[in-house]
């Protein structure tokens, strides 16, 4: 699926390993945690519909979100998980990250899931603000979560209203 926005940014889902190197390069620029190529392949090969990309008019990858569906440890219900989100610094503050997250949330909700989770560094104010503006809630502090020793917040988005 390909969607054009203002003829400048094109959104599409993952369709081929030909773009994997570009995804890895973009994610490695922004995220502090290193991932092996096997981690990327695990996500994109199992859930290609949950890997959304944004390209500029020249075809350059400028944004990506990589997600999966897994089981909640306590309830055994399926839930969405956002593993990676990155937008090229030159293209930030244009709504690209919001569009990528909202698109994936819509797909997860269509699959009947109750929630979507992710972790974000407590020092990553931009990410925390983005997710809060999209309706994610901080549900847990995870001390020393990252290899660098940085703490993280677990964030959750609930598709069904809390009662």
Task: Describe the residue ranges of each PLM region.
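Acetyl-CoA-dependent GNAT
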Residues: 3-90, 101-111, 158-162
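Short amphipathic alpha-helical segments embedded in low-complexity Lys/Glu-rich regions
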Residues: 39-45, 59, 116-123, 145-147
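Active-site acidic-Proline motif in GNAT/NAT acetyltransferases
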Residues: 88-90, 94, 122-123
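Short coil/turn segments at alpha/beta junctions that flank glycine-rich nucleotide-binding fingerprints
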Residues: 94, 111-114
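Short glycine/proline-centered loop/turn elements that form peptide/ligand docking sites
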Residues: 97, 101, 124-127, 144-149
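Conserved catalytic-core motifs of GNAT/GCN5-like acyltransferases
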Residues: 117-120, 132-154
């Amino acid at each position: 699926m390909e969607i054009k926005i203002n003829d400048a940014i094109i959104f599409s889902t993952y369709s081929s390993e030909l773009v994997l190197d570009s995804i890895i390069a973009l994610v490695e620029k922004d995220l502090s945690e290193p991932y092996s190529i096997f981690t990327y392949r695990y996500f994109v090969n199992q859930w290609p519909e949950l890997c959304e990309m944004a390209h500029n008019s020249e075809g350059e990858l400028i944004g990506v979100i990589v997600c999966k569906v897994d089981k909640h440890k306590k309830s055994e219900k399926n839930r969405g998980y956002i593993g990676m989100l990155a937008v090229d610094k030159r293209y930030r503050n244009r709504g690209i990250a919001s569009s990528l997250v909202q698109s994936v949330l819509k797909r997860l909700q269509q699959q009947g899931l109750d929630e979507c989770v992710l972790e974000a560094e407590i020092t990553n104010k931009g990410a925390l603000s983005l997710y809060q503006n999209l309706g994610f809630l901080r549900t847990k502090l995870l001390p020393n979560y990252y290899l660098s020793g940085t703490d993280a917040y677990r964030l959750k988005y609930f598709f069904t209203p809390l009662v």
